[in-house]
């Protein structure tokens, strides 16, 4: 398991070689959280050269959020705020990143393994598909309303917070979202957990 993460300063973290088998180009990553048991990871990744990898299947649920630069996945070009998610077993198209691009990488339920493929693995649910989102084109939604938070799955309305829901697993309810707080917002400790892992 990954240790519980409090507030960290990424400036204190060191760069490691990027964990991208079968890729061409150079990348480095800073581990924000790393599960040494199964390889799950949250990291900042920097591409030090133009970078590319063929289409294939990751050994983990894999998410990229573009902080700066440009990522092309299949025919989709993503810039700052661009996001993609591929569940384990779903084909990720060929992908490129331009030199200097930085992303947040999230990898769950598996390690850095990757195999070339042009078809999804059998046995996937119908809703397990490649997701591509441009968060800059999304509206910030107040957490006071139930959608998209789905309070029936847990959580509490939190006035003053706003989210952009990037992905939600319909079976587990697990999700990836962006959060922003209104000016002067203060947390009520019973309404919201005080730690952000990613």
Please annotate each region the language model reported.
Residues 44, 84-85, 98-116:
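A short hydrophobic beta-strand segment most commonly corresponding to one strand
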Residues 23-24, 54-56:
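Short loop/turn motifs at secondary-structure junctions and domain boundaries
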Residues 1-37, 114-175:
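A short, N-terminal "cap"/entry segment at the start of jelly-roll beta-barrel domains
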Residues 44, 49, 158, 170-171, ...:
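A structural signal for the main folded, soluble domain(s) of proteins
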Residues 48-51, 57-73, 80, 182-198:
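Glycine- and acidic-residue-biased ligand/ion/polar-headgroup-sensing regions
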Residues 72-93:
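Short acidic-glycine-tyrosine-enriched beta hairpin
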Residues 47-50, 67-68, 85-90, 107:
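Short acidic (Asp/Glu) patches
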């Amino acid at each position: 398991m990954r240790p519980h993460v409090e507030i960290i300063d990424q400036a204190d973290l060191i760069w490691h070689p990027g964990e991208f088998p079968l890729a061409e180009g150079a990348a480095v990553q800073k581990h924000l959280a790393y599960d040494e048991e199964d390889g799950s990871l949250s990291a900042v990744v920097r591409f030090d050269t133009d970078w590319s990898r063929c289409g294939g299947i990751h050994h983990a649920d894999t998410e990229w959020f573009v902080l700066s630069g440009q990522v092309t996945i299949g025919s989709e070009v993503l810039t700052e705020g661009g996001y993609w998610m591929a569940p384990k077993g779903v084909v990720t198209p060929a992908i490129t990143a331009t030199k200097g691009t930085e992303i947040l990488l999230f990898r769950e339920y598996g390690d850095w393994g990757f195999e070339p493929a042009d078809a999804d693995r059998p046995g996937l649910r119908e809703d397990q598909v490649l997701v591509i989102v441009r968060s800059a084109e999304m509206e910030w939604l107040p957490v006071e309303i139930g959608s998209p938070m789905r309070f029936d799955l847990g959580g509490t309305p939190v006035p003053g917070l706003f989210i952009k829901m990037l992905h939600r697993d319909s079976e587990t309810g697990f999700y990836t979202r962006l959060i922003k707080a209104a000016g002067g917002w203060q947390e009520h400790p019973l309404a919201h957990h005080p730690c952000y892992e990613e």
